[in-house]
Amino acid sequence: MDFDPTLPQVVANPYPVFAARRAVEPVGWSDALGEWVTFGHAEADAVLRHRGLGRLWRLRWPDEPLPNYTLLHEHSLLENEPPTHTRLRRLVAAGFGRRQVERLRGRVTEIARGLAWDVRDAAAGGSTVDLMPLYAEPLPVAVIATLLGVPDEDRGLLRPWSNAIVKLYEPAPPVDRRRAAETAATEYVGYVRGLIDYRRRHPGEDLLSDLIATRDADGSRLSEDELVATAVLLQMAGHEASVNVVGNGTYALLSHPAERARLTADLVPGAVEELIRYDSPLQLFERTATEPVRIGSVTVEPGQKIAALLGAANRDPAVFADPDRLDLARWPNPHLGFGAGIHFCLGAPLARVELQASLATLLTDLPGLALAGEPTRHPTFTHRGFATLPVTVDRAELNRS
């Protein structure tokens, strides 16, 4: 049976499909995608690390120019290989390392606790509230906006642009989505250029000001287009992947009351890794072969694409005992939720801090949080997350806390 990630049952719950395909073949051809796909952990890891498989940007619709959408990808460190990738990553990492992110931990916790109290107020009297717009979405959006120095009054502009752009990462997006993505990219690029111009004249204590000022060893800096693409990439990761990390992780925790009951502050760091493994916010990451590459039992020929299915890798029983069980104390936990190799997620430290702060806040400020009916998922495969997440808050639990 062909692997088709657009099927509603696959979007709703891909993990049984992954398991069935993995039992037959760890790597297979997908007619629906027109590329190879991996179902095993070892094979996905090999795809992500092999230097004969690269991120080679090419617009999928050559007869339909999307100039600003293309600009954001042609100049992105995510879509380039060495030596361009090496230079971009070195410059960006200088202002976005673990040490800089750790300095944000207190602010992230402050934002999370403020949002938790908004949830408490909205749920007063036993009301059902949607946790996505009240908590899971604004937390990462506020954090990345703070990091990049985006004014508070502009934050509402950014997520709709990001959301329109990432819809083109799904298989076979229709024409109207492509046009919407280009419109969003045009507005996004224009906004970020204006913000860069302002920060050139008025540097602040933010990452964008740091990126503008950062020089490489040879004195080179990020170009204007590279600055735009980098700022948008970081914002989009904060708006999409990080939102889904918080939403998916919270749902998984609330769906497993026994695991939630055992969650204590000392378990939070490991619990974060398990929640990312259990329901990966990014399910698919592509590479293109630049030479014949052997992955498992197949040879990926030059020009062919192969997709590492990260969610499938993270449920591989050859690596994870009882992989369909949520185990907050699981260790070791070599999940591929942040990728691997030279394109390992640059924002992983920030995503971890966000989810750690989120879980700690659930423990301290929302002990009575509970699911209130079935949530709804976005109808997308590549970016896996919730559109709604209805919850209630038990006032008696709050009073006891």
Regions found by a protein language model. Give the residues of each.
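Cytochrome P450
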Residues: 1-401
